[in-house]
Amino acid sequence: MTDQPPPSGSNPTPAPPPPGSSGGYEPSFAPSELGSAYPPPTAPPVGGSYPPPPPPGGSYPPPPPPGGSYPPPPPSTGAYAPPPPGPAIRSLPKEAYTFWVTRVLAYVIDNIPATVLLGIGMLIQTLTKQEACVTDITQYNVNQYCATQPTGIGMLAFWFAWLMATAYLVWNYGYRQGATGSSIGKTVMKFKVISEATGQPIGFGMSVVRQLAHFVDAVICCIGFLFPLWDSKRQTLADKIMTTVCLPI
């Protein structure tokens, strides 16, 4: 049976799909619209690879410093850098240091409160003493022996006064002089004790040690206290041990 052409008026044979089509429906948007929504990829640079995309939401953290070391961490909360040291006191003329007589007057003023407190304690102890007598009767004699002794109130008053005087001296020579450079007597006489190395007050602990070092001045018949009369820096032996000087305010 031979093929016959389709009769006139029947449906024509559908046209073949365009090349590259899988036979489905054509997209509902034009290629120009696709190109405006998604830009075509750029050609790879010479070398064959694309640069890395930027990180989402910001930039990469900076790389660590070379050598694998990192900067030291910041100081913890509440830490402060130490204050810069003051100027060193090394080469002043002798006249720039405090006179010996001025230092003696300051010492007297400093010790007046402690002397008054101890005097009150001793006075109460003396006024409250009581007398105790013992009688010795023999065949031929009657002997009586008497002695005075402090009462409990007198002893309590003396030791309380002694503690108060000691506390005053520690406060005056340790805390006050260590923090400001001047005890009460030195403030009245207008001079201060400072370190030769820093030019600053020496602090509570070193100020107490300096007072104890005056034992060296006293143990050689108090000659150490006379050193400021001829020393070029008018220092006592305790000052030389502690490297301190006295300067007018």
Swiss-Prot record:
Chief subcellular location: membrane
Annotated region (Disordered), positions in chain: 1-87
Subcellular locations according to the entry: Cell membrane
Annotated signal peptide: none
GO CC field: plasma membrane
The Sequence repeat ranges on this chain: 34-43, 46-55, 56-65, 66-75, 76-85, 101-123, 134-156
Pro residues bias (residue ranges): 1-20, 38-87
Keywords carried by this UniProt record: Cell membrane, Membrane, Repeat, Transmembrane, Transmembrane helix
TM spans (from-to): 104-124, 151-171, 212-232
One Pfam family it belongs to: RDD
Domain called RDD: residue spans: 99-242
Region 5 X 10 AA tandem repeats of [PV]-G-G-S-Y-P-P-P-P-P, annotated ranges: 34-85
Region annotation 2 X 23 AA approximate repeats: where it falls in the sequence: 101-156
Membrane topology: Multi-pass membrane protein
Entry text on domains: Its N-terminus, which contains the proline-rich repeats, is highly immunoreactive.
Family under the similarity heading: Belongs to the mycobacterial Pra family.
UniProt-recorded name of the protein: Proline-rich antigen
Taxonomic source organism: Mycobacterium leprae (strain TN)
Lineage summary: Bacteria, Bacillati, Actinomycetota, Actinomycetes, Mycobacteriales
Gene name of the encoded protein: ag36
